[in-house]
Structure formats: structure tokens, C-alpha cells
Amino acid sequence: MVVSKKLMKVGPWGGAGGHPWDDGGHSGIRSITVSYDRSIDSISVEYDRDGLTVPGERHGGAGGTGNHTTQARTTSIKLSFPDEYLTTVSGHYSPIAHGGSPVIRSLAFRTNREAYGPFGVAEGTPFTFPVDGGVIVGFCGRSGWQLDAVGLYVAPLRPERMSDRVQQLGLSAYRAVWQRIGRPQQRHEPVEQLNGNAQIIHKT
């Protein structure tokens, strides 16, 4: 697997609660550990950096939902790196309680070999980011007692396809924001170019 060092940052999806975190982009992903119950309680990712294992920090709570009255389940996904690599992350986000801030309610992962999940509860606004001709090499987002939001770092497997993928995203990869006051309306947010890299910023 040959990954370009040119990265694209997408997201985050979810709410504005908690504190921002950013694992950055790496050579690849070796494992993902998710704790979940009614929402995604926490996520931690073990990365590869030029052949060395890089343990990631746990982002989120210590187990259970927001009031910690239940115990979260934990699942570890170990990829057969470097032959297996992450290509798609999807999920849902919504408030757990009425009037609360949205949090990540579910997550699912797909590699070039397998599908994992979904983990959590598939309720709320769905999101997905499939990578065509590339690989997901990092995570970012927001977290407090739970995982509030999640974003991704993406690198092309073949650098020459980067410009084609950016153009495709600029035309078709928009986030639909549904306003729940009155009749739903749809707003689109295009790709932004930052220092030669594509960055899709989803506002909540």
C-alpha cells in the first residue's frame, strides 16, 4: 500500500459539545477501539507511522451514557495492516435528550476487505464518507463525556487521482442540513481549498 502524503480533511459530523481533538494523519490505521451504548462513548485508534505503531489517545468518556448509569460495551477492530485499510466511515448523530447537543449515536467502518458495525444506536441524522481510490489515515473531532463529533483525514492511494477526487467532491459531496423549523430546507456546503489541500467543513 502506497499512500500519498497529501491529505484531505473532511468533517466533522456531529455536535459542538466537548473539546476539539485531532490525531492528525498517519501512514495507516492498525486498529480501532469503540465503546458504545445509546451513543458512542469513546473511540481510540492505533496508527502506523512509517512502520512504527503509534497508540492513539482515547477520546470520550470512561463508559456508559451521559449520566453513566449504564456500562458501555467495547469492541476492538484489528485490521490486517498493511493489506487491509479503512475506506469508509459512516454513522448517525442526534441529541440523546430533548434539547441537548447532538452526539455521535452510531459508527460503522468498512475496509477494502470487511464491514464492521454498526456500533451504537442508528438514530438521527445519517452521514457517510466513502473513499474512492484512497484510504482513511486519521481521525479528529470533539469529545467530552461522549464522542460529540468525528472527522477524517484521507490520503489517495495513487497521488495522480487526488485532483480528480477533489473535483468530484466539489460537485457532489455536500452536506444536507435540514432545518426543523417549518418546512425542511436543504443547504449545501462545498469543498474548500486550503494550501492546496481539499477540506470539507461541515457546520452544525
Question: Which ranges hold each PLM region?
Answer:
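Lectin-type carbohydrate-recognition ectodomains
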Residues: 1-204
